[in-house]
Amino acid sequence: MVASLSYQNGQKARSHPLLSLAGLIELPPSPLFGTDGIRGQVGELLTAPLALQIGFWAGQVLKNQAGVTKPIIIGQDSRNSSDMLANAITAGLTWAGIEVWQLGLCPTPCVAYLTRESEAMGGIMISASHNPPEDNGIKFFDSSGLKLSGTLAGQIEAGLRGNLELADNSVNWGKATFCPELIQKYYQAVIASVGTDINLSGLKIVLDLAWGAAVNLAPLVFQTVGAEVICLHDRADGDRINVNCGSTHLESLQAAVINQQADLGFAFDGDADRVLAVDSQGRVVDGDYILYFWGRSLLEAGQLPDGLLVATVMANLGFERAWQKLGGQFLRTAVGDQHVQAQMWETGAMLGGEQSGHILCHHYGVSGDGMQTALHLAALVQKSAVSLANLVDHSFVTYPQILRNVRVEDREVRRNWQQCEPLRREIRKAETAMAEKGRILVRASGTEPLIRVMVEAETLELANFWTERLVAAVRSYLL
């Protein structure tokens, strides 16, 4: 029997023995769910008792939505805390009567793909993406492999806060099975997405695997299609995941590409849902360039309806104007791949992504996939018969763009920063002064305790000037 759920109108529900754990858990007053599930420092926000309850309520909510009981798939990255959180969530899910298929170490897009292809009830990934090792997170996917809607996330949180009641309290234990063999299906799908005739022989590629989720699969993918592969940070290491490596620290990849005289390199983040590239000269090829190259290829093949690309407010003006010169349309969304995804579904766009390297191509799937993106870019380089460096040279010139982060520990201050009128006044002053010469974006990070300040201008001098002014204002008014 599938339990039905109801809200308690402010009354604490006490309809299941699992709620006896509530005394062990102190939840922050602000919402647990951010832009990418639940994320925080392990031992503070994220604990085993909380993960147990998250598993239980996620199982109840997904079961109620589906109307039937099907398995839930769980994957994880290499963090030291990932085993603990995965097992605690599994315990909660099986308490809710859900069958669990555990994949072990795998990329986030693997969970999304297998959830969709196996018609599972949902998927869960234990990862804090690009965050440092002491953090971790819990990402949720619905049966379509899409990130969980705000409505369903809100229901899970209502259960955690004791504001959701089960109409049926009967207990039917679920079973947990370790199924790493399922990962092979994802590996095959990634290669199949570029066609069976792909051959990257002659390309020397450096992969920075960030001590994370891609260490087993990414080298195998590129070796299978004929590339010469050199790997950095290529073991699962929970102490070093993302530390001075991966997509947020490209220095070691840049040096390796130059020293090894490689054609190009790719850097993944901890869960491999995003990727950045480096050309043979050591220059960073970010998500804007990747979207431009892949988009132009699809446009020339007649596979990009209305020439439409979806990017975010972080996308460089140089990229936008270059794309428009090709005759394409360019839409911007708020930061976050879930916002890009929503705009793509709404408009029918087939390609979108973020400067940070989250790229979504609906021709091949519904989630951002670092390995798939890297493979398609490498195939595009091979097909073009010119180097990635040459493609960059003949694409577009970026406007100087500076991004600075200000650490703000107070969660409520970060959440309500836009109510700070003196800071808003400083931002308006900067926007007026910049006029058509650039852009300003101040926002709270959805995944880290940071206020991000981005200034883009026609000259580096102008960008530096207003960045320093705004960073000083954030520190003055929010700290």
UniProtKB/Swiss-Prot annotation:
- What are its E.C. numbers? 5.4.2.10
GO CC, any one term? cytosol
Q: Does the keyword Magnesium apply?
A: yes
Among Gene3D superfamilies, the record links this protein to: Alpha-D-Glucose-1,6-Bisphosphate, subunit A, domain 3 (3.40.120.10), Alpha-D-phosphohexomutase, C-terminal domain (3.30.310.50)
Q: Which InterPro entries match?
A: A-D-PHexomutase_a/b/a-I, A-D-PHexomutase_a/b/a-I/II/III, A-D-PHexomutase_a/b/a-II, A-D-PHexomutase_a/b/a-III, A-D-PHexomutase_C, A-D-PHexomutase_C_sf, A-D-PHexomutase_CS, Alpha-D-phosphohexomutase_SF
* Pfam short name (any one): PGM_PMM_I
Instruction: List the keywords (alphabetical).
Output: Isomerase, Magnesium, Metal-binding, Phosphoprotein
UniProt PTM comment: Activated by phosphorylation.
SUPFAM superfamilies xrefs: Phosphoglucomutase, C-terminal domain, Phosphoglucomutase, first 3 domains
Q: Which cofactor does it need?
A: Mg(2+)
Q: GO: which molecular function terms?
A: magnesium ion binding; phosphoglucosamine mutase activity; phosphomannomutase activity
Tell me the protein family, please.
Belongs to the phosphohexose mutase family.
Report the function annotation for this chain.
Answer: Catalyzes the conversion of glucosamine-6-phosphate to glucosamine-1-phosphate.
Name of the protein in its database record = Phosphoglucosamine mutase
Recite the lineage of the species.
Bacteria, Bacillati, Cyanobacteriota, Cyanophyceae, Oscillatoriophycideae
Give the gene name.
glmM
